Amino acid sequence: MKHLLIIISILLLSSPIFGQSFVSVGNSGNIITSSDGISWTKRTSGTREYLKGVTYGNGLFVTDGNSGTILTSPDGNSWTKRTSGTSKYLRGVTYGNGLFVTVGWNGTILTSSDGISWTQRTSGSQQFHLNGLTYGNGLFVTVGESGTILTSPDGITWTERTSGTWVYLRGVTYASSAFVTVGKSGTILTSPDGTTWTSRTSGTSNELRGVTSR
């Protein structure tokens, strides 16, 4: 049983809490849900693709993943595949200011007002993979390969920011009037506005893959 728990924790990623519902996604199209975080139920996703990000907004769950995969669900139980218009690997999705935004490889950025119809946007960073995404204080922030940080007030027009690092940034979040991003070699950067970033001492040289707050 110990080995089984280890496997699940590795394969099933991205578990945000939405009210009384948990939704977790991962390898081979796996989606599981729980009302209390204790008892979990496997759902039928209709795909075998790796699923990476999951978010909730405007009454809809949205998950993204390999080969341009986007799935939506009103309740976390029944899922519908949507047309993304890309075959790129998608690596993060969030909801803010009435808009869903997903990001991925080669600077891919897609937006949708309803989670169903998606539009590709110009990131200006096509040579780099994007891996993390958040929304806070009226700003979308995405991070990725080679220290890439992009910001947008509307999800449509994006501006590249100076991170001061070339490491792969893996995750980003916003809370308490600050953005925080983490990545390889124990990298942690913080910013009050998404524009100016400061390196912080993490105390580890191991890769950091995710960050959150309450």
Predicted ranges, named:
Residues G19-R214:
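Residue-level hotspots at or immediately adjacent to binding/recognition sites across diverse folds
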Residues I10-L11:
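Short, linear, compositionally biased motifs with a strong N-terminal bias
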Residues M1-L4:
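Positively charged n-region of N-terminal signal peptides that target proteins for export
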Residues I6-I7, I17-F18:
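Cleavable N-terminal signal peptides
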